[in-house]
Amino acid sequence: MRYSLRSLATACVTLLLVSISFAQNEPLIINTQVMPPYSASYADYFNNTQQVFITITNTSTQSRSIYLAGSIATLDGSVRAEVTGGSPWGGPPLEVPPGAHEYSGTDLQPFAAGGGGDVQYTGITQEQIAAGLLPEGEYQLCLRAYDYTTNEVLSAAEPLGCSNVFTITQPGPPLLLSPDCGELV
């Protein structure tokens, strides 16, 4: 009995170590949070320091020079604007030393300012994006890290790297508060 328990414990520890080593293929872990209030203007997510928080954890022992690619999309996939990896953004690389580091959407503006890969649109046009308003729906913002020089994937694919689900609604028409009905102006 004692021998079989020791064998079972050894097998469990070995299985755990093997699964951990397979789970750590990508050296970066991205966590994305979108905070309320949720705006229909996509620019608000990168102009407001309190709207989007991105935590990048570098699990390796070396600093990484990266760029981010990703998408903002409805859960049903009917609306999607996506920048795929394979072409670094026009700005300098984002340097991520070992450990966990938090960024806001505004922190990333200088890095992405020069643009990057081609934006692919589904269910929305470039003109609608330029006008700044996203259609109503339930959205997620998903990000993935790539090596700035080699374009090697450094973080896991969706759904990892995706934000919480957030709902965008268009404001209703204004309500007239004054004057009261029958009151003279």
Features from the language model and the residues they span:
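Proline-enriched interdomain boundary motifs that mark the N-terminal boundary
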Residues: I29-I30, P171-P179
